[in-house]
Amino acid sequence: IRDSSTSRGSEMCIRDRSFAAEFNIDDAITRVNTDDYYYDRSEMVKAAGSFSEFAKNYDLDVPQALELELMSKHIKELLSGKITYLPKYDMSGTAIRHDNYTLAKPSKIIISEGLFTLTEKVKDAFDFKIYVDIAEDIKKERFYVRAKERDLGDSADYIYKNANEKAAVHIRPCKAYADIVLSGSADRIKYKNFLNRIIAVIQEVYFAE
């Protein structure tokens, strides 16, 4: 699951948690968050004095900002039946990544979401891919909400412009790899109905008695 403004991708993952709780199958679903694979740049943030100053000179909007090879390795380990420890990235503005943080057990279903989930180094790890296409005005609104939460200050405009330009190169072309493309501005009821259909298929294929 990926989109260039992850709110709807996150909504899909929230819905999968509801499904897991409803059918008491949480152990049958493993979640691997792409954003947790950002490299640790905490020392660079400290040297810059703040995350907003750091972000002016470090590009977080390219696949090279993440250790996607490690993500692919972890998914392959899970698929081979191995217990794996996943990293956890602090999104509060410290740029700290805690390695070997989250215990992940092999399961029938592995779900991942994030900006770079369908890029070259990890896309082949997934059997089924969903791209959520977000209108430009909605993406911009969501970005500035997050920018305020992360205290980006006067760096926000530059970061948004850079993110939009890089998305045109690294993210939007990934739509071609998706099995299904969803409209991120679709009616929520229709959107949830679609998710319920996907979940019904998962239930039938993987959890039918």
Give the ranges of each region predicted by the language model.
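Anionic, Ser/Thr-rich low-complexity intrinsically disordered regions
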Residues: 137, 154-162
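ATP-dependent NMP and nucleoside kinases share a basic, alpha-helical "lid"
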Residues: 96-150
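A conserved segment at the C-terminal end of the G1
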Residues: 15-26
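Conserved nucleotide-sensing/catalytic segment adjacent to the nucleotide-binding pocket
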Residues: 30, 39-91
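NTP-dependent small-molecule kinase module
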Residues: 18, 105-106, 124, 144-148, ...
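Receiver (REC) domain switch/active-site residues of two-component response regulators
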Residues: 35, 127, 179
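Conserved catalytic segments around the Walker B and adjacent sensor/switch elements
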Residues: 25-33
